C-alpha cells in the first residue's frame, strides 16, 4: 500500500515553492532593472569633440566618473608623511632650501594636491615667477605640458615644437582646464590613450612600440606621461630654440642609467649657488621607481591602487578620485591583501620610516658638502681642484632627489630606494673627504660650521633669497595678468559649442 503524504508536508512544499518563485522573480527584476540602468547610463548626452578640454563636458556623458573626479577637490586627508592637503615642504624641512639654492624650488615647494588644482597651484607658485606679459617670467611654456587637457589641443593647433617654445606666460590664456579626461582617454571609444609626445618618443628611442601596450600596461602608462623624470632639451636637432620635453631613458630607467645619460651630454639643471656644482633636479620619477618594485613585478598597475574599480547601479567604473590608497584601503589594498587595516598601515609606515630615516642622513651630508665647498671657493680653490668634488656633490644629490621626488617611492620600491640612498651616502662622504683634504691644503684645518637653518625663513635668508620681493611680485601678477588670462579663455570657450545628441 503506497504511503500517503501528510497534508502538512504538501503545504510546506507548496509554500516553499511560492517563496522560491517570489525571490527568483525579485532577482530577475533586479537584473533587468540594473541592465536598464546601465543602458540608460551609457547613452551619451553630448558629442565629445576630438580635442575637447573641458572636463565638465565629458562629465555629461560619464556622470559617475565625473562625480568621483570632482572629489579631487578634497584636501583634508593626511597620512603620516603625505596625503592631499597643501603642506609647505620647505617649512617642514628647511634643509631643502639649501639643497636647491639658486633653483626655483628654494623659493616655493608644496606637497601636491589633487589634479583639479593643477592650474591654480602652478599659477600661485613662486617658481613660475611674476610675468607681466607673454615674454617675461623665468619659466618656459613647456611647464604647462602636464597640467591640462588644453595641452594636446594647443599642440595639435600649433605643433609640438611650437608649444615648447617661448615663455610660460605665453600660453596663460590657452591652458586653463585642470588635468582631466582628455589627458588619458580617446573621445570616441574612451580607450586609454597617450596624449603627450614625450612618452611616445622615449619609447621609440628605446626601440619599443607603445601602441603594443596591453590595457593593463596602459593603466600605468597614462600616468607615466607625467609622473616621470624629464628634462628640457634645448639642443634637440630640428627644435633649436625650444625647451623640448625629453625623458632620459635611452640607456635605461635606473638612477645610474639616467645619470650617465645626463653626464654624457654635460647637462645641468642649474649651478648651485653655494658650491657651484652643476646640479641635476630630479622631477618625479614615480614610474621608474614603481617598475623596480614588487607590485609592478606582479602586474599591478597604478590605477589598480590609486583609481580602483567601483560598482554603482549595476555599472562597474573606475574611481576617478585619484588619491592615496590609504584613504580607500577597502577598495584598493584589500582586493588582494586580507590583513587588517591596522596591519596594512603598519606595513606601509614601516617601509616609509626606514627610507626617510636614511634619506634624511644623506640630506644632511649633502648640505654640509655644499657649505664646505663654498668655504673652499672662498679660500681660493681652483676649478681643477674642485672638479671631482663637485661631481660627487652632483651625483649624491641626484640620488637623494631621485628618492625624495619619487613620491610614494618608499612604498613602491623600498629595496631599490634603500640601495640608491646608500650609494648616495657613499658618494657624499667621498666628496667630503676630498673637501677635508683640500681645505687643509688651503690652510684651513677646522670644522666648517653647520648653518642655522632651523626654519624656512632662516634657510632662505642664509642663501640670500629676497622672499618678500618675490611674494609682492606674485600678488601683482595674480591681481593683474592672471584675470586677463581667465577673461580671454572664457571668451574663447564661449565659441566652442556643446553638441547635444537629443537621446
Task: Please identify what each model-predicted range represents.
Residues 1:
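Tryptophan-rich substrate-binding surfaces of secreted polymer-degrading and adhesive proteins
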Residues 4-14, 24-118, 156-304, 308-484:
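Primarily the internal scaffold of c-type cytochrome electron-transfer domains
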Residues 16-18:
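Single-pass type I membrane protein transmembrane segment
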Residues 105-137, 141:
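Asp/Glu-centered strand-loop micro-motifs enriched in Gly/Pro and often flanked by an aromatic residue
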Residues 133-154, 159:
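A cross-kingdom signal targeting lumenal/periplasmic-facing segments of multi-pass membrane
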Residues 488-503:
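Extended, compositionally biased alpha-helical segments that mediate assembly or anchoring
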Amino acid at each position: 500500500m503506497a504511503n500517503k503524504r501528510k497534508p502538512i508536508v504538501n503545504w510546506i512544499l507548496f509554500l516553499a515553492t511560492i517563496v522560491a518563485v517570489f525571490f527568483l522573480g525579485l532577482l530577475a527584476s533586479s537584473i533587468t532593472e540594473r541592465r536598464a540602468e546601465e543602458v540608460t547610463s551609457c547613452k551619451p548626452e553630448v558629442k565629445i569633440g576630438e580635442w575637447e578640454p573641458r572636463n565638465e563636458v565629458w562629465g555629461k556623458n560619464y556622470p559617475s566618473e565625473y562625480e568621483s573626479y570632482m572629489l579631487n577637490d578634497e584636501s583634508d586627508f593626511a597620512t603620516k608623511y603625505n596625503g592631499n592637503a597643501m603642506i609647505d615642504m620647505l617649512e617642514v624641512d628647511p634643509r631643502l632650501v639649501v639643497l636647491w639654492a639658486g633653483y626655483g624650488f628654494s623659493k616655493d615647494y608644496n606637497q601636491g594636491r589633487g589634479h583639479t588644482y593643477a592650474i591654480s597651484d602652478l599659477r600661485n607658485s613662486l617658481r613660475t615667477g611674476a610675468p607681466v606679459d607673454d615674454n617675461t617670467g623665468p619659466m618656459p611654456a613647456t611647464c604647462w605640458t602636464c597640467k591640462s587637457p588644453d595641452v594636446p589641443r594647443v599642440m595639435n593647433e600649433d605643433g609640438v615644437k611650437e608649444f615648447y617654445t617661448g615663455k610660460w606666460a605665453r600660453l596663460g590664456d590657452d591652458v586653463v582646464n585642470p588635468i582631466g579626461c582628455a589627458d588619458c582617454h580617446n573621445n570616441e571609444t574612451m580607450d586609454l590613450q597617450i596624449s603627450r609626445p614625450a612618452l611616445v618618443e622615449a619609447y621609440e628611442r628605446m626601440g619599443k612600440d607603445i601602441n603594443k601596450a596591453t590595457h593593463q600596461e596602459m593603466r600605468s602608462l597614462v600616468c607615466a606621461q607625467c609622473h616621470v623624470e624629464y628634462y628640457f632639451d634645448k639642443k634637440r636637432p630640428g627644435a633649436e630654440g625650444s625647451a623640448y620635453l625629453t625623458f632620459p631613458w635611452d640607456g635605461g630607467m635606473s638612477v645610474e642609467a639616467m645619470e650617465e645619460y645626463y653626464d654624457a651630454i654635460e647637462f645641468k639643471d642649474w649651478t648651485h649657488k653655494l658650491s657651484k656644482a652643476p646640479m641635476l633636479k630630479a622631477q618625479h620619477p614615480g614610474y621608474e621607481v614603481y617598475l623596480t618594485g614588487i607590485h609592478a613585478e606582479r602586474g599591478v598597475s597604478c590605477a589598480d591602487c590609486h583609481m580602483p574599480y567601483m560598482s554603482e547601479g549595476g555599472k562597474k567604473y573606475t574611481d576617478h578620485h585619484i588619491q592615496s590608497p590609504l584613504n580607500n584601503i577597502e577598495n584598493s589594498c584589500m582586493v588582494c591583501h586580507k590583513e587588517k587595516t591596522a596591519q596594512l598601515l603598519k606595513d606601509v609606515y614601516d617601509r616609509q620610516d626606514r627610507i626617510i630615516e636614511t634619506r634624511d642622513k644623506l640630506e644632511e651630508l649633502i648640505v654640509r658638502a655644499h657649505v664646505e665647498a663654498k668655504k673652499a671657493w672662498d679660500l681660493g680653490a681652483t676649478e681643477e681642484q674642485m672638479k671631482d668634488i663637485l661631481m660627487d656633490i652632483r651625483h649624491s644629490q641626484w640620488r637623494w632627489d631621485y628618492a625624495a621626488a619619487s613620491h610614494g617611492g618608499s612604498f613602491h620600491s623600498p629595496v631599490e630606494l634603500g640601495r640608491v640612498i646608500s650609494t648616495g651616502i657613499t658618494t657624499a662622504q667621498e666628496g667630503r673627504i676630498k673637501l677635508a683634504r683640500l681645505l687643509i691644503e688651503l690652510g684651513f684645518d677646522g670644522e666648517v660650521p653647520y648653518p642655522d637653518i632651523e626654519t624656512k625663513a632662516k634657510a632662505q635668508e642664509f642663501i640670500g633669497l629676497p622672499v618678500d620681493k618675490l611674494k609682492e611680485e606674485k600678488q601683482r601678477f595674480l591681481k593683474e595678468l592672471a584675470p586677463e588670462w581667465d577673461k580671454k579663455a572664457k571668451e574663447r570657450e564661449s565659441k566652442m559649442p556643446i553638441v547635444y545628441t537629443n537621446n
